[in-house]
Amino acid sequence: MKFIIKLFPEITIKSKSVRQRFIKILQGNIRNVLRRFDDDARVRMDWDKLIVSSRNDQFREQAIEALACIPGIQAFLEVQASKFTDLHDIFEQVKAVWGDQLEGKTFCVRAKRHGKHEFSSLEVERYVGGGLNQHCVSNGVRLKNPDVKINLEIDGEELFIVSAIHQGLSGMPIATQEDVLSLISGGFDSGVASFQFIKRGCRVHYCFFNLGGAAHEIGVKQVAYHLWNRFGSSHRVRFTAVDFEPVVAEILEKIDNGQMGVVLKRMMMRAAAKVADEFQIPALVTGECVGQVSSQTLTNLNVIDRVTDKVILRPLITWDKPDIISEARRIGTLEFAETMPEYCGVISKKPTVKAELSRIEAEEENFDFAILDKVVAEARYLDIRRIGEETAAEVQEVETTAESGDNEVILDIRSMDEHNEKPLLVEGREVMHIPFFKLTTAFGDLPKEKTYLLYCDRGVMSKLQALYLKEKGFANVKVYRP
């Protein structure tokens, strides 16, 4: 298999040195991602494109899925590559590939060249198009809106016949910009905000302030792992979990009710800045949107920002909620967010919408900052690549099996799209489909005399859900890995 990678246009207009650096970074990113499943993948750098090749055609679908999610790629062409001698040879090769597919259809030929040739791109289009029109049973040439568009790329002595064009993610290659630390809660906003900076070329590390116990942390890890695994797996990033319950308890006891929301956000920014300093990260990212909740007025955001010199980036600051939800659906975090509890907004009954810095600072004089220092010092740092391994260790008491028994039901917990695309069929066994985001509420209604085997494609989600169900007191659960 072979693909031609078309660069995001902003890369191509950079100066020569910057463009070459960005392309080289993208080359490494693609190589890192593809070699997670295909050791034979090769990535060759050219002036305005990259060429990906592998002898392992069985990984074609995985490669297409991976390339579509790598920042910096505008589009990628699936091609058949060969050498050619002259125009007629090009025609013969194109006819062998496309001839049978033109029956009863209009078509046109589009060619792009790079290098020195005795013919122009237009001459290629005319010669190949005219030859196909004469030798194939088609409905003729139509230059505008044809039924079939045949794309050719000629680079030196190489001919690339394009069989499919796939849309890329666009954006900048990861690591062309500086690192950021995203304050992730698992909700709609923070996941989308994190994605925006992945797409813009930043390594996005994650900082989670735990207000809801182990189940909440498991859910947020799922979101962070999903974002990394789908869009950012070319680079190592960290997931930091900070137990913020002692901080909330201190706020509830010492801070005036109306000021609690702003004070809590200021404490989070202080803690996040300390975490960022630990890893020399210059900026923080939040999913805040102006006016969405009481703490997100311009006045309050200004007061919140005063606690740190770090740049606080808010990519969703003007987004409407329906647009955020739509983007969450597109990037695959919607289903996580729909079942994620929100804790931050419930601690103030009458929150201020116009905080005064002097009053906030006066309230904070009652706060014991040793508590904040302690929770940051005790924060847990995790290489996000190890989330799956850590989960496996945490659920070691949950049996993993490749077989199913007579009194066992296989539960396919993948999303609806994944289930519909590749339904799980096990001969002679009952298979039920309950998406992971409905499992928490639906599991208690299932017959308790049966044992349920949780299945997902990679085994990470099933292990996380098994741990959660175990914590809820359900013993009749296993992980299914056929």
UniProtKB/Swiss-Prot annotation:
Pfam families, sorted: Rhodanese (PF00581), ThiI (PF02568), ThiI_fer (PF22025), THUMP (PF02926)
Xref: SMART domains: THUMP (SM00981)
GO biological process, one term: thiazole biosynthetic process
Any one GO molecular function term: ATP binding
Keywords of the record: ATP-binding, Cytoplasm, Disulfide bond, Nucleotide-binding, Redox-active center, RNA-binding, Thiamine biosynthesis, Transferase, tRNA-binding
Binding site for ATP: L183, I184, K265, G287, Q296
Keyword RNA-binding: yes
NCBIfam families the UniProt entry points to: ThiI_C_thiazole, tRNA uracil 4-sulfurtransferase ThiI
This protein's name: tRNA sulfurtransferase
Gene (UniProt): thiI
